[in-house]
């Protein structure tokens, strides 16, 4: 065994040790949240060793395989793939989760089931690492289903609340639709290639692979909340804030994009799939950015920003730039986790208040949290020399030099400016203007379990983009030199968005609206998607099934067959019997006339 395999196994052993301890009596004698946080911290430190060696030696990839089981002619192996994507994402995920775990010990300290909560978060991380390091479809599926199940348990953590249960069910049901696509791809690869190993699938690449690629795209659409299967993502904010931070930064929602990044050799020459990804991502990033503009729940604004960034990653994949999409996954994890943790700190301090209209002037009473919130918001918009800039600027340069589907690319640029608008809206309502919260709230942000994780992620939000961007493989952006106005597009769009948002916020504070604006209603009600998909469609289908099953059953089977058939039979028999009036002479005369007519006809026939 080499250093890479040893490191991966050691990371998994360290992460599994808290799970095993939680099943024994040892959990009663240790500080379980602290133990788990320490395990993840050491796992992160260990993951740096293979990461640095990988970059130093300019390695491409390395596969570690153990035989598992043979089914008929197909051999299943347990194989781990150590390449640029898996080894870098492992370090990023461990660093972010280390901070979230420490934050959870502060945020959930009063919860009686905090040990189980920490265990669920650890399992969430483990299943995501299984997904990223897997080298065959079966292991990918284990990690894929694992993150889905753990998200269901964590979103519905406060199971006494109806909204939390509904949100958890939404997440699992929308992901079931995506799982259908994943299973379709697995079945196709099994039948046509007789293998689930990624190497064999990539080497036997042919042009007749539209069905599995559409299956993988459906899977990514469900998991990464692309347009059409997106309503579960804002609903998932019903879970605790640490769950939202982990879910949106480095686990669940980026799993779909990571899946398409992993299979990018199959999509490179398939123009239909590339165009579909481009248009789907553009539609997602614009729609969710519009929805974020008028939301008032701070967590939902950040959730919609995640969905918008996922759409941007899908656009990048549609432009055939998988390394840029992966770079944005890694940079996005730092500031998105920090944004959620800052919002959690504010919500916790303001007695569980999430409405940004009831905040204001947090800067003076929570200077550290508000400063980090501003840094995270600026990084999200792609402000120069923060982490988000290094990925977003490259993506916008790629958009400007790309020669496919100008409408989709223009929509993406508009959505990017909207990112600056809703980020400025958060900064304006939370940190600026006058205080709008009750004066008797006690605010304390001096706990090291709160300060240290946000501090680490703040450093990551400033410096991580520079470090990661200089270690990604060269991308295939066609034009390496461009005019200054194209080069500064990202900055111009962000600054314009900030200025427009600031002006609009200042104006709306002075206006009095008599009635709701229909355009605002479209954005506030999330494009009427929840109403249509969750209310009208089920109601119509249930009414149709009710009428089909009950009305037709009642009309045909219960009326025509049993009661009405009996009554009809009795009526006919009664009619037959009541026709006999007892007129014997009349009956004999009729009989005689008939006999005479028959004899006449018979005699005519004989002649």
From Swiss-Prot:
Q: Which residues cross the membrane?
A: 3-23, 35-55, 84-104, 117-137, 140-160, 171-191, 210-230, 241-261, 272-292, 301-320, 324-344, 365-385, 405-427, 457-477, 482-502, 586-606
Give the family, as the similarity comment puts it.
Belongs to the complex I subunit 5 family.
Q: Membrane topology per the record?
A: Multi-pass membrane protein
In the record, which residues are listed under signal peptide? none
NCBIfam families annotated for this entry?
A: NDH_I_L (TIGR01974)
Q: What is its EC number?
A: 7.1.1.2
What does the organism's lineage look like at the top?
Eukaryota, Metazoa, Chordata, Craniata, Vertebrata
Q: Which InterPro entries match?
A: NADH_DH_su5_C, NADHpl_OxRdtase_5_subgr, ND/Mrp_TM, NU5C-like, Proton_antipo_N
Protein name per Swiss-Prot or TrEMBL: NADH-ubiquinone oxidoreductase chain 5
* Assigned GO CC terms: mitochondrial inner membrane; mitochondrion; respiratory chain complex I
Localization, UniProt: Mitochondrion inner membrane
As for what it does, the entry says:
Core subunit of the mitochondrial membrane respiratory chain NADH dehydrogenase (Complex I) which catalyzes electron transfer from NADH through the respiratory chain, using ubiquinone as an electron acceptor. Essential for the catalytic activity and assembly of complex I.
Sorted alphabetically, which keywords does the UniProt record give? Electron transport, Membrane, Mitochondrion, Mitochondrion inner membrane, NAD, Respiratory chain, Translocase, Transmembrane, Transmembrane helix, Transport, Ubiquinone
For whether the record's keyword set contains Ribonucleoprotein, the answer is no
**What is its EC class?**
translocase
Known catalytic reactions: a ubiquinone + NADH + 5 H(+)(in) = a ubiquinol + NAD(+) + 4 H(+)(out)
GO molecular function terms attached to this record: NADH dehydrogenase (ubiquinone) activity
Q: How does it assemble?
A: Core subunit of respiratory chain NADH dehydrogenase (Complex I) which is composed of 45 different subunits.
